[in-house]
Design a protein with these regions (language model features):
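Short helix-capping/hinge SLiMs at alpha-helix to coil transitions
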Residues: 28-34, 48
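Short amphipathic alpha-helical interaction segments
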Residues: 46-61, 67-72
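Short, cationic-aromatic polyanion-contact patches
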Residues: 71-100
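Short amphipathic alpha-helical segments
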Residues: 22-26, 39, 53
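Short alpha-helical segments that sit at the start of domains
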Residues: 1-27
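Short glycine/proline-centered loop/turn elements that form peptide/ligand docking sites
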Residues: 17-18, 34-36, 53
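Surface-exposed alpha-helical segments enriched in charged/polar residues
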Residues: 26-29, 57
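Short acidic, hydrophobic short linear motifs in intrinsically disordered regions
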Residues: 33-44
Length: 103
């Protein structure tokens, strides 16, 4: 039986192997109804800040969208004091999350 620390390290390694779009879905699932802005996703996932916005745009505009703007229209301020859209998963996004190999 694995120690909890080993299990969390294994899970983190699996998340890092996901595509960027699937990492967005994974982290939005964790954040639930609170959601996340593009800036928050950059802080969580790391990498190039210009790579997250195209992923959330693609995921929200797909024929079956996996993410959507927060249903209450919630926005949060970023480091530059600008309002940012808060993204949450759609029901299809939750279903897709279940197929990810991180659980």
């Amino acid at each position: 039986h694995k120690e909890p620390k080993d299990t969390s390290v294994d899970a983190f390694a699996k998340v890092k192997r996901l595509t960027l779009s699937n990492q967005v879905i994974f982290h939005l699932k964790i954040r639930g109804f609170y959601g996340a802005t593009n800036s928050e996703l950059v802080a969580i996932i790391g990498g190039n800040p210009n790579s997250i916005q195209p992923r959330t745009a693609d995921l929200s505009r797909a024929s079956v969208p996996y993410v959507q703007e927060h249903p209450d229209g919630v926005k949060r301020k970023n480091a530059y004091d600008n309002d940012e859209i808060v993204w949450v998963l759609t029901p299809a996004g939750y279903e897709h999350y279940k197929t990810l190999e991180v659980r």
